[in-house]
């Protein structure tokens, strides 16, 4: 499996660094005919009489009981649970030439109220508290019943990953912005690959084929309203939508859509948020595109909240894609350091606020021509990322996305930071650290934090990148996709993960993506397995 890990990482790396060429191709391509295309940003959903009903193919080339589209956290979780619920023949389709999607390059942090690391430290937490945090951060746009179902599934899902999949976590607990308490666990290698790798092995054990380079061209919904299968292209070569051999696959029970978001699709994301031009990089792998968002809408799936698109506030402009600098900016500087505007030498945001607040603050300063940096000293680094993600600092320094300075004066000179103002900012942090009181921006001092002042000093430049789509297909708490015209579940169609909306609202809290995908994938898989065969 070491060879598999290396090949997948090499594949993702090569895709990320050829992104400009790929996206130029995507920008020239028309995903669908003009009759099916969502023409403007105001068309968030199709109208009732626009929901397509498709003629059945003359013959089906093959059949399965359940077809799962997407091989990330959500898709593999859905497939496993469906198979274990005696669904019969379950298959997973992946359009790219390696499995995992964004899940492979995920940071491996998983929000779990009541996890063993919390219990060991005496941290009191509950599904209700996590739900409250999510609803507050999401500005009330999250659907309470969906959030409740997901948060109650958090600890059982964590235990499932450990006991059934064999996923390994370290013994640390972390806190992302917007969470009331530290509650996320870290995978042993600090990457979502630890989970995907174990999910793939589990799928193989269960006899679930994960078929690569299979592009879903059409979701086939019959005149009776039921989804009955897919038109696909086998042997697809990303991003050429006309490549591959057309085949029809019958889904006797259900199709489960786990195709993820569209962060890498500049044209489509600009329909929903015109500000997110190609000037914004994305943390997503290039396959995070819009074709199944468009297709699910075409057949009557209700798209909700698609204009809520999250930018990661902690990324660096000195590397492509997700990169590694964020683990310093968030893991060290946001928790036990400071973020400053280099033009003023002052903090400009609560470093533990939710991602939208922080990203908006960085972008506002960037638009003024100001550089913003995340800053921490040696003590902060030793207390945080050196423990939670061993060896990550070496990688960050090697890639020159985190920068090391012997003295604070050297750092200030490099970034033209007014030294007096910077020293005053650090003194203010140290005052609140000594008193144990929140600062003027509302940041609570992280438990165990020490005063800042022990060189050498480290920093990374901040530049938000498109990260996560909070909107998507409307589903109920069982994972059933809701029809735009009837407000009832579309028979035979389920969805989970980033392809769905109503879970996070306006803002997704960090570490809740893994929870969302795994928990809701499992829920959708179990429910889909209960469907009766239509033929």
Q: What do these predicted ranges mean?
A:
Residues 34, 89, 95-209, 213-218, ...:
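Conserved N-terminal/central alpha/beta ligand/cofactor-binding core
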Residues 17, 21-39:
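N-terminal secretory signal peptides and thylakoid transit peptides that target proteins
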Residues 293-417:
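An anion/pyrophosphate-binding glycine-rich loop and adjacent beta-alpha core
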Residues 66-91:
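N-terminal Rossmann-like FAD-binding beta1-loop-alpha1 element of flavoenzymes
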Residues 60, 79-81, 247, 385, ...:
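C-terminal structured subdomain/cap of oxidoreductase catalytic cores
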Residues 421-507:
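A glycine-rich dinucleotide-binding beta-alpha-beta segment and adjacent secondary-structure elements
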Residues 221-248:
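Conserved beta-strand-loop-beta-strand element in the redox core of flavoprotein oxidoreductases
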Residues 237-244, 250-319, 514-523, 527:
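Glycine-rich loop(s) and the adjacent beta-strand/alpha-helix scaffold that form part
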């Amino acid at each position: 499996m070491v060879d598999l890990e290396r090949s997948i990482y090499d594949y993702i790396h090569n895709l990320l660094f050829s992104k400009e060429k790929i996206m130029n191709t995507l920008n020239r391509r028309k995903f669908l005919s003009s009759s099916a295309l969502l023409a403007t940003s105001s068309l968030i959903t199709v109208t009732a009489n626009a929901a397509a009903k498709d003629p059945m193919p003359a013959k089906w080339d093959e059949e399965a009981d359940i077809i799962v589209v997407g091989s990330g956290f959500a898709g593999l979780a859905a497939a496993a649970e469906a198979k274990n619920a005696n669904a019969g023949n379950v298959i997973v389709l992946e359009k790219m030439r390696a499995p995992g999607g964004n899940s492979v390059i995920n940071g491996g942090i998983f929000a779990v109220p009541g996890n063993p690391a919390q219990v060991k430290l005496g941290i009191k937490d509950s599904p209700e508290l996590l739900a409250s945090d999510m609803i507050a951060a999401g500005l009330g746009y999250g659907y309470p019943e969906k959030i409740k179902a997901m948060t109650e599934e958090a600890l059982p899902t964590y235990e499932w990953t450990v006991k059934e999949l064999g996923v390994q976590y370290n013994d640390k607990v972390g806190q992302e912005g917007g969470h009331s308490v530290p509650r996320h666990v870290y995978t042993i290698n600090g990457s979502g690959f630890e989970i995907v790798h174990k999910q793939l092995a589990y799928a193989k054990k269960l006899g679930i084929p994960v078929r690569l380079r299979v592009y879903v061209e059409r979701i086939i919904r019959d005149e009776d309203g039921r989804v009955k299968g897919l038109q696909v292209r086998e042997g697809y070569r990303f991003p050429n939508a006309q490549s591959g051999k057309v085949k029809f696959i019958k889904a006797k029970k259900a199709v489960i859509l786990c195709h993820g978001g569209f962060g890498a699709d500049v044209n489509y994301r600009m329909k929903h948020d015109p500000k997110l031009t190609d000037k914004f990089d994305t943390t997503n792998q290039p396959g995070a595109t819009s074709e199944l968002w468009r297709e699910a809408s075409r057949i009557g799936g209700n798209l909700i909240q698609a204009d809520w698109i999250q930018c990661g506030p902690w990324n660096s402009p000195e590397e492509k894609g997700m990169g590694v600098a964020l683990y310093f900016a968030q893991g060290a500087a946001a928790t036990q350091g400071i973020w400053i505007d280099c033009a003023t030498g002052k903090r400009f945001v609560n470093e533990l606020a939710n991602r939208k607040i922080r990203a908006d603050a960085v972008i506002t300063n960037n638009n003024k021509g100001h550089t913003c940096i995340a800053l921490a000293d040696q003590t902060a680094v030793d207390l945080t990322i050196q423990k939670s993600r061993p060896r990550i600092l070496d990688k960050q320094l090697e890639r020159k996305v985190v920068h090391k300075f012997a003295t604070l004066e050297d750092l200030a000179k490099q970034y033209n930071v007014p030294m007096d103002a910077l020293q005053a900012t650090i003194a203010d942090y140290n005052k609140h650290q000594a008193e144990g009181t929140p600062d003027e921006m509302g940041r609570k001092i992280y438990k165990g934090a020490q005063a800042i002042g022990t060189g050498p000093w480290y920093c990374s430049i901040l530049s938000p990148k498109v990260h996560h789509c909070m909107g998507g297909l409307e589903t109920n708490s069982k994972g059933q996709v809701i029809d735009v015209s009837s407000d009832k579940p579309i028979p035979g169609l389920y969805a989970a993960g980033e392809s769905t909306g109503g879970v996070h609202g306006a803002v997704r809290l960090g570490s809740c993506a893994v929870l969302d995908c795994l928990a809701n994938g499992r829920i959708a898989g179990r429910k889909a397995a209960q469907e009766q065969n239509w033929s």
